[in-house]
Amino acid sequence: MERKFLTDLGLNPDQVNSIMAQYGKDMQKYEGLEAERDALKKTSSELSNKIEDLKANSANIEDLTKQIEKLKLDNENATKQLSAQKLDFAVTSTIKDFGAKNAKAVKALLNHDDIRFDSKGNLTGLEEQLKSLKDSDSYLFAEDKPAGKPIQAFLRGTGSWRQGCQPASEDCTKIERINK
């Protein structure tokens, strides 16, 4: 509103001043409300953007959570598989140490549920089964042969063992290899 407009209407200067003062107060309120509205619009826009970002991130978080769970499961399966392989290797090695002729055949006759590693990393439950199996099905295992006497060899033409044999000679070396 302008002063000239009010004076053209026939108002005296005191009336124009009081109308302009009231108009100024109203304009300040209006401008304050307008600034508040603009700030709220800006805040609303920022919040809308944040909500959209959070929606996008929540989808990413869900995907990441699923990936983490899958990786945990894969890791658990790999650990179980590694433990099973370690147990299988230890069982096979022990079976061979017991002198089994066919490790697969012996392994098939074992109760694998009773075979475990104890807290110290030693196999439990296997040795008893192998001893029992060796007693009942001894044909699966090689015979325990006692160590025999060394072969007695005679040097050519001497008639006695190692008589006249020089330690560096070829004949002595052959005899020592045979006796070992």
Swiss-Prot record:
Entry keyword Heme: no
Gene Ontology process terms (BP): viral capsid assembly
Signal sequence segment: none
Assigned keywords, A-Z: Viral capsid assembly, Viral release from host cell
Subunit structure comment from the entry: Homodimer.
Record family assignment: Belongs to the SPP1-like scaffolding protein family.
Functional note: Scaffolding protein involved in the icosahedric procapsid assembly. Coassembles with the capsid proteins to form the procapsid, in which the scaffolding protein is found within the external shell of icosahedrally arranged capsid protein subunits. In a subsequent step the scaffolding protein molecules are released from the procapsid.
Designated name of the protein: Capsid assembly scaffolding protein
Taxonomic placement: Viruses
Name of the gene this protein is made from: g20
